[in-house]
Curated annotation (Swiss-Prot):
One of its GO terms (cellular component) is host cell cytoplasm. Interacts with the DNA polymerase accessory subunit UL44. Interacts with HCMV major transcription-activating enzyme IE2. Interacts with host HNRNPK. This is Protein UL84. It is found in: Host nucleus; Host cytoplasm. The keyword S-adenosyl-L-methionine does not apply. Residues 10-19, 32-41 have a biased composition (Basic residues). Its main location: host cell. It comes from Human cytomegalovirus (strain AD169). Keywords: Host cytoplasm, Host nucleus. Residues 1-47, 136-183 are annotated as: Disordered. The keyword Acetylation does not apply. Belongs to the HHV-5 UL84 protein family.
């Protein structure tokens, strides 16, 4: 058999290697070019880009990287890989978009990696999560073991009691003071290896398209391949107390506002135990009944007011809400003040016939001489009709929600009824004109083991950073003015939204404030007393363990809603969550 020149054999193989994109010098560039051509066709294909999973990273390690056999398994077989709630799902653009695969499982983190060319970012494009996304607890009903016959009989015997407890819980949840339920909100933030800088975004887990805005640096236009890397996860958020104020204690009274009314007995009634029948006999609303059911053997002080009041106009700000304000005082005995003890909260109970519906409690202070002073405010131009009737109820209690040092108005405004966004609106209480960069200080503190996160609503000519608000501190917001003529905030202008994160967290040395397009997240491991290697996600100076994030459940389209225990913020039917990337100026 004749010998073949090895050089000829190598020359014959090189063209095939170049066509296949493997081996040799420049193979990576050829592979990236081929991927970019496929990606360009995918992005231009109507209407959306479907993503497939290529990596499933568990808390113990990597299950597979480029193994297509895992992707071709049935959904039931895939569950054994992704059934654990402590997993990371990685989505890329490597697979054919015409055959989107169904992914099932519960994950705490979804990572998205796309390799693009700079010119492909000029036009907006969409990213479709083809599998319905739902937020729910990891220990849902679908993962519990089947009940035995004895357990089923016991459950049936207690079913009426459970219905009654469920109804009572529903009534409590409808009342603001008992609404301590956690909710979930989706967070999208760039990974540390991302070249594209999308803005830090929070949005409800609802079906539909959510806009992600991004900045394209001039340096990126000179790169051959641009990496877009996103982390998608769900934060636990909780609504702060809005209708109750903590009782503040001060040594001396310094104010120019005089007391419009000084109360004495029998307007003051001290109840060591709260009689529900007596309280609800003259209740102002159904909410009062729900509030009274939460009373234990806690000492309660009730201040009854039915008088003609004098009103003073205030512009709102440090002193409290805007509107007409009246100050009322009451002298407490030394025994009564001591019996109340610490952690006392006050709330108004209105009379529907003789109380303005917008009457709120704006300040509550007990001085060292035993004088209790409180302000009531109504936002109107004319004084309410006389007399005004309401009750101030003071009670010692333990709250499980963040609360403010003073009335949240006019700085923090609750969202409109039925609004999809759960965040408080942060507004300017007065007209403000800025010529240069400025730091706004909002004179409110909040208390509790939570983190406040301010997400700005940027206006033309100025920008504000995303800011983490720590407990027991003022909220300080930096405003960067880019317009030469300065910027003007009209009164009640929207600055942004405020969220309170209830996920367990630890503070690290990261920056607590950054521009929206500069916020990045990092996935790292940390040794704790409970786990030798616990995976955590760090963002904006805070680290959160993956197990403390709200689980995200990816269910197949045929999955019925009753098959899984979901929270309030779930996707309706089987509509997917869509992310649209728009590149340009933020």
């Amino acid at each position: 058999m004749p010998r073949v020149d090895p050089n000829l054999r190598n020359r014959a193989r090189r063209p095939r290697a170049r066509r296949g994109g493997g081996g040799g010098v420049g193979s990576n560039s050829s592979r990236h070019s081929g991927k970019c051509r496929r990606q360009r066709r995918a992005l231009s294909a109507p209407p959306l880009t479907f993503l497939a999973t290529t990596t499933t990273t568990t808390m113990m390690g990597v299950a597979s990287t480029d193994d297509d056999s895992l992707l071709l398994k049935t959904p039931d077989e895939l569950d054994k890989y992704s059934g654990s709630p402590q997993t990371i799902l990685t989505l890329t653009d490597k697979h054919d978009i015409r055959q989107p695969r169904v992914h099932r499982g519960t994950y705490h983190l979804i990572q998205l990696h796309l390799d693009l060319r700079p010119e492909e970012l000029r036009d907006p494009f969409q990213i479709l999560l083809s599998t319905p996304l739902q937020l729910g607890e990891a220990n849902d009903e679908s993962q519990t073991a089947p009940a035995t016959l004895q357990e089923e009989e016991t459950a049936a015997s207690h079913e009426p009691e459970k219905k009654k407890e469920k109804q009572e819980k529903k009534e409590e949840d409808e009342d603001d003071r008992n609404d301590d339920r956690e909710r979930g909100i989706l967070c999208v933030v760039s990974n540390e290896d991302s070249d594209v800088r999308p803005a830090f975004s929070l949005f409800p887990a609802r079906p539909g398209c959510h806009i992600l805005r991004s900045v394209i640096d001039q340096q990126l236009t000179r790169m051959a391949i641009v990496r877009l890397s996103l982390n998608l996860f769900a934060l636990r958020i909780i609504t702060p107390l809005l209708k109750r104020l903590p009782l503040r204690r001060k040594a001396a009274h310094h104010t120019a506002l005089h007391d419009c009314l000084a109360l004495h007995l029998p307007e003051l009634t001290f109840e060591p135990t709260l009689d529900i029948n007596n309280v609800t006999e003259n209740a102002a609303s159904v909410a009062d009944t729900a509030e009274s059911t939460d009373a234990d053997l806690t000492p309660t002080l009730t201040v009854r007011v039915r008088h003609a009041l004098c009103w003073h106009r205030v512009e709102g700000g440090i002193s409290g809400p805007r509107g007409l304000t009246s100050r009322i005082s009451a002298r407490l005995s030394e025994t009564t003040a001591k019996t109340l003890g610490p952690s006392v909260f006050g709330r108004l109970e209105l009379d529907p016939n003789e109380s303005p519906p917008d009457l709120t409690l704006s300040s509550l202070t007990l001085y060292q001489d035993g004088i209790l002073r409180f302000n009531v405010t109504c936002d109107r131009t004319e004084a309410p009709a006389d007399p005004v009737a309401f009750r101030l109820r003071l009670r010692r209690e333990t709250v499980r929600r963040p609360f403010f040092s003073d009335a949240p108005l006019p700085y923090f405004v609750p969202p409109r009824s039925g609004a999809a966004d759960e965040g408080l609106e942060v507004r300017v209480p007065y007209e403000l004109t800025l010529k240069n960069s400025h730091t706004l200080r909002i004179y409110r503190r909040f208390y509790g083991p939570y983190l406040g996160v301010f997400v700005p609503h940027n206006r033309q000519g100025l920008k504000m950073p995303v800011t983490v608000w720590l407990p027991r501190s003022w909220l300080e917001l930096t405003v960067l003015v880019s317009d030469e003529n300065g910027a003007t905030f009209p009164r009640d202008a929207l600055l942004g939204r405020l969220y309170f994160i209830s996920s367990k967290h630890t503070l690290n040395r990261g920056c607590l404030s950054a521009m929206t397009h500069q916020v990045k997240s990092t996935l790292h491991s940390r040794s704790t007393s409970h786990s030798p290697s616990q995976q955590q996600l760090s963002v904006l100076g805070a680290s959160i363990a993956l197990e403390d994030l709200l689980p995200m459940r990816l269910a197949s389209p045929e999955t019925e809603p009753q098959d899984c225990k979901l929270t309030e913020n779930t996707t309706e039917k089987t509509s997917p969550v869509t992310l649209a990337m728009v590149c340009g100026d933020l």
